[in-house]
C-alpha cells in the first residue's frame, strides 16, 4: 500500500495507506458515525464534493454488492449509478470480505470507480478535530507527490461556492411507472407535446413531479411502490406548465443558496395552494427558502443512522438516518409555517409544515438506505394528499 497524507485546511496532517484508486483529490472533510451502509453512502449523490470519514473502526468486511438494474430502471443495491464521494477515509480496512451478496472488495470497487481510499488514519482524532473546529476543506496527497507541492500555497475551492446539485441532477426528463422501463424525454420537448405523452403513459396513476437535486434510488422506490407515476426533472427545470398531482423535492449535495432557480420554481408551484408538496433533506431547505426562511451551515452536520427526532406537538420520537450539513433556522419561519420535527440532540430543525396548505418536509431520510425505516410513513402521508 502506498503512503498517503490527508491535509486539512488548518494544517493538520493525518498519515495513512492507500487502498483505493491513487490520485490526489480535494473536498470537504466530513464524518459519518454509521456502523454499516458504505455502498449506499458512497453512491448517495449528497456526498458529492466530500471526503467521507467513517468512524466505525472496521470497514470493508462485507464487501460490495453487484450493480444490477431492476426492470423499472432502478439500481437494486446502490443509491445511484456511481460513487459520488470524492474519497473514503477509514481506520482499519478489511481486505478479506464475506457476504452472500458480495461480488468484489471495497478496494476493487474504488479502483474501478477511480475513487481514493485511505486506511490507517486515526479517525477518532480526525473526528475530534472536525467536531471542535467544524468541517473543513482538505486534500489527499500521495507520498512523493506531497513533496512536489507547496501546500501552504494550495488553494481549494470552498465547498459552499460550488453548485454540486447541477453536477448530480439528471439532464433529461425521466418518467417511472413502477414496472416498465422508464421513459426518457429531452428537456427541450414542448410542454403540450410532453403533457400529451405523459397522459398516455398510465392515466390511472397519480402523477408526481420529482425535482432531482441528487435523488437517492430508494426515494424513487418508496414513491413507486405506492403506485404513483414519477416524473423526474432536472433541478432547474420549470415544471409548472406540466399536468401533475403532487410535487416532490429531493435530497442533494452542497449549499441550498446555489439553487435559486429551484426555489423560484417552487414558489411558482406554491401559487396552487391545493398542490401537495413534500421535500426531503435538501428538499426541506429549498421548500423553507421558498417559504421565506433562512438556512445556516451546521458546525459538523448530521451524518449517521441514529439521529433522534421528535414530532413537534407530540411525545413521539423517531430514530432516523441523516446526511446533511445545513439546517433551517426555525426563528426565520414565517407565520404560515411551523416546525414539524426537532432534533433531540441539538434542537435544530428536522422538518417543516404549512399551517393550512398540504406542504411539508423532512430534513432526515425517511427512505433510509441505509438506516432505520421508522419514518417511511411520511411517503404514505404524501400519497394520501394526492
Language-model regions, residue ranges each:
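Residue-level detector of beta-strand face positions
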Residues: 5, 308-310, 351
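Short acidic/histidine-rich motifs immediately flanking catalytic phosphotransfer sites
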Residues: 242-249
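A glycine-centered loop/beta-turn motif at secondary-structure junctions
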Residues: 351-386
